[in-house]
């Protein structure tokens, strides 16, 4: 007699375990599953658990050489989504042993690597992940975090101000540096390379770094404040990226920048380690995020990408504005802003937070509001994001009819006014424009 029956078998026999008690060390995932017509939700949920952990479509004899019960992902709870036809939230628990320590790359390859192309599913979205302390402790996390950054910059009790230098492509290095200087001199804390400024024929990276450093030091000398410019170190290879970060450190500037999704988590984590070892702050841009997170029923929600970045490492990350030109709902955005900044975040479904998350004092990340905002949004932004944030106005600074320094000054004045009014107990939402 044979040891097992060959043939295709239902996933739910092995991978749907509604009685399972989740462990403190499990990585928990919440998926929004839209099964194909005729596929029961239990089978779809079990299929997700199987395909993203130990499963294959049939029993193989090598299954006998390991303990499936120890290593398999388990679908432990399913709930229908209110107001949606044939859509379910499926909860899956993964044993910690399935993941390499300190590798966001491996975590994602395991959890979302294969399962999204699965035939039994019409659509699949990863809504949230619970990262247990046992796993988050294997990551360095942000190079410095919010508190250390404030100490380095000597700026307290208010949001920081930034500005992306526009036109994003086409300026020469010297003119670029001039724009940087004018904005910093006018009162901003930071200026920023656009995410697609790397090292193009009209402006090579080394020239840009040099002129921006000059602009920073000149503005610092004249204002008596610490200034920075996010020098984009993103490059075609990890080696080239590190080379750029090394040059930035040699110039003595305070901060570099990386596009973490296009650059990849492996490169990002390498850069974050370099930044902590060498005292550089790291600004993270989320170019490509909407490709992954914009569809409501398929992809990965940005709060998961934000959690992954906090593990991989970054001191700032773009997180939507609630008020500008790009999409983002207020409560949901505030949910993942808290996930970035706070130590303990309680489960709260109204804000899209499916699991309580405990970060064990992994440093926090400053959320960056950027994209189509200008000075009249300031009261709203100050109220929504609070002190620990970076507010970035690109066109909102350089678009000032009198030029960059007045544009920068206007933003700074507005910010100081809003913060002062708030501290004096006025209601920003109501009285913002008079302030």
Swiss-Prot record:
<feature type="binding site">
    <location>
        <position position="194"/>
    </location>
    <ligand>
        <name>Mg(2+)</name>
    </ligand>
</feature>
<keyword id="KW-0560">Oxidoreductase</keyword>
<dbReference type="GO" id="GO:0019253">
    <property type="term" value="P:reductive pentose-phosphate cycle"/>
</dbReference>
<feature type="binding site">
    <location>
        <position position="168"/>
    </location>
    <ligand>
        <name>substrate</name>
    </ligand>
</feature>
<feature type="binding site">
    <location>
        <position position="370"/>
    </location>
    <ligand>
        <name>substrate</name>
    </ligand>
</feature>
<keyword id="KW-0120">Carbon dioxide fixation</keyword>
<dbReference type="Pfam" id="PF02788">
    <property type="entry name" value="RuBisCO_large_N"/>
</dbReference>
<dbReference type="InterPro" id="IPR033966">
    <property type="entry name" value="RuBisCO"/>
</dbReference>
<dbReference type="GO" id="GO:0009507">
    <property type="term" value="C:chloroplast"/>
</dbReference>
<dbReference type="InterPro" id="IPR000685">
    <property type="entry name" value="RuBisCO_lsu_C"/>
</dbReference>
<feature type="active site" description="Proton acceptor">
    <location>
        <position position="285"/>
    </location>
</feature>
<feature type="binding site" description="via carbamate group">
    <location>
        <position position="192"/>
    </location>
    <ligand>
        <name>Mg(2+)</name>
    </ligand>
</feature>
<dbReference type="GO" id="GO:0016984">
    <property type="term" value="F:ribulose-bisphosphate carboxylase activity"/>
</dbReference>
<feature type="active site" description="Proton acceptor">
    <location>
        <position position="166"/>
    </location>
</feature>
<comment type="subunit">
    <text>Heterohexadecamer of 8 large chains and 8 small chains; disulfide-linked. The disulfide link is formed within the large subunit homodimers.</text>
</comment>
<feature type="site" description="Transition state stabilizer">
    <location>
        <position position="325"/>
    </location>
</feature>
<dbReference type="GO" id="GO:0004497">
    <property type="term" value="F:monooxygenase activity"/>
</dbReference>
<feature type="binding site">
    <location>
        <position position="164"/>
    </location>
    <ligand>
        <name>substrate</name>
    </ligand>
</feature>
<dbReference type="GO" id="GO:0000287">
    <property type="term" value="F:magnesium ion binding"/>
</dbReference>
<feature type="binding site">
    <location>
        <position position="286"/>
    </location>
    <ligand>
        <name>substrate</name>
    </ligand>
</feature>
<keyword id="KW-0601">Photorespiration</keyword>
<comment type="function">
    <text>RuBisCO catalyzes two reactions: the carboxylation of D-ribulose 1,5-bisphosphate, the primary event in carbon dioxide fixation, as well as the oxidative fragmentation of the pentose substrate in the photorespiration process. Both reactions occur simultaneously and in competition at the same active site.</text>
</comment>
<dbReference type="GO" id="GO:0009853">
    <property type="term" value="P:photorespiration"/>
</dbReference>
<keyword id="KW-0113">Calvin cycle</keyword>
<keyword id="KW-0602">Photosynthesis</keyword>
<dbReference type="InterPro" id="IPR036422">
    <property type="entry name" value="RuBisCO_lsu_N_sf"/>
</dbReference>
<dbReference type="Pfam" id="PF00016">
    <property type="entry name" value="RuBisCO_large"/>
</dbReference>
<dbReference type="InterPro" id="IPR020878">
    <property type="entry name" value="RuBisCo_large_chain_AS"/>
</dbReference>
<keyword id="KW-1015">Disulfide bond</keyword>
<feature type="modified residue" description="N6,N6,N6-trimethyllysine">
    <location>
        <position position="5"/>
    </location>
</feature>
<feature type="binding site">
    <location>
        <position position="195"/>
    </location>
    <ligand>
        <name>Mg(2+)</name>
    </ligand>
</feature>
<dbReference type="InterPro" id="IPR020888">
    <property type="entry name" value="RuBisCO_lsuI"/>
</dbReference>
<dbReference type="InterPro" id="IPR017443">
    <property type="entry name" value="RuBisCO_lsu_fd_N"/>
</dbReference>
<keyword id="KW-0934">Plastid</keyword>
<keyword id="KW-0503">Monooxygenase</keyword>
<keyword id="KW-0460">Magnesium</keyword>
<feature type="binding site">
    <location>
        <position position="318"/>
    </location>
    <ligand>
        <name>substrate</name>
    </ligand>
</feature>
<comment type="similarity">
    <text>Belongs to the RuBisCO large chain family. Type I subfamily.</text>
</comment>
<keyword id="KW-0479">Metal-binding</keyword>
<feature type="binding site" description="in homodimeric partner">
    <location>
        <position position="114"/>
    </location>
    <ligand>
        <name>substrate</name>
    </ligand>
</feature>
<keyword id="KW-0150">Chloroplast</keyword>
<protein>
    <recommendedName>
        <fullName>Ribulose bisphosphate carboxylase large chain</fullName>
        <ecNumber>4.1.1.39</ecNumber>
    </recommendedName>
</protein>
């Amino acid at each position: 007699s044979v040891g097992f029956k060959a043939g295709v078998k239902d996933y739910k026999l092995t991978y749907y375990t509604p009685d399972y008690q989740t462990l403190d060390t499990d990585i928990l995932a919440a998926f929004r599953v839209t099964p194909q017509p005729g596929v029961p939700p239990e089978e779809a949920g079990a299929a997700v658990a199987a395909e993203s952990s130990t499963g294959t479509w049939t029993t193989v004899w090598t299954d006998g050489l390991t303990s499936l019960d120890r290593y398999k992902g388990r679908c432990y709870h399913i709930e229908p989504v209110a107001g949606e036809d044939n859509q379910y939230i499926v909860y899956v628990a993964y044993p910690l042993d399935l993941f390499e320590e300190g590798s966001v790359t491996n975590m994602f390859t395991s959890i979302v690597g294969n399962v999204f192309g699965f035939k039994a599913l019409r659509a699949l979205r990863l809504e949230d992940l619970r990262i247990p302390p046992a796993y988050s402790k294997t990551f360095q996390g942000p190079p410095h975090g919010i508190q250390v950054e404030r100490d380095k910059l000597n700026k307290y009790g208010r949001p920081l101000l930034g500005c992306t230098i526009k036109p994003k492509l086409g300026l020469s290095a010297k003119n670029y540096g001039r724009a940087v200087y004018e904005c910093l001199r006018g009162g901003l804390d930071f200026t920023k390379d656009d995410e697609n400024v790397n090292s193009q024929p009209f402006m090579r990276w080394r020239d840009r770094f040099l002129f921006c450093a000059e602009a920073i030091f000149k503005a610092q000398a004249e204002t008596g404040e610490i200034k920075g410019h996010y020098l984009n170190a993103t490059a075609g290879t990890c080696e080239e990226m590190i080379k750029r970060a090394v040059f930035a450190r040699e110039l003595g500037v305070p901060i570099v920048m990386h596009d973490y999704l296009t650059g990849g988590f492996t490169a990002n984590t390498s850069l974050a380690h370099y930044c902590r070892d060498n005292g550089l702050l790291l600004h993270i841009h989320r170019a490509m995020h909407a490709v992954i997170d914009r569809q409501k029923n398929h992809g990965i929600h940005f709060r998961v990408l934000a959690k992954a970045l906090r593990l991989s490492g970054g001191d700032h990350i773009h997180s939507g504005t609630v008020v500008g030109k790009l999409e983002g709902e207020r409560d949901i955005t505030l949910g993942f802003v808290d996930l970035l900044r706070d130590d303990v975040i309680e489960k709260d479904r109204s804000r899209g937070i499916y699991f309580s998350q405990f970060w064990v004092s992994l440093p926090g990340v400053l959320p960056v509001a950027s994209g189509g905002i200008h000075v009249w949004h300031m009261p709203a932004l100050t109220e929504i994001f609070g002190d620990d944030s970076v507010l970035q106005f690109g066109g909102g600074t350089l678009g000032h009819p009198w030029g960059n320094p007045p544009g920068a000054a206007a933003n700074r004045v507005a910010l100081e006014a809003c913060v002062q009014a708030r501290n004096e107990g006025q209601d920003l939402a109501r009285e913002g424009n008079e302030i």
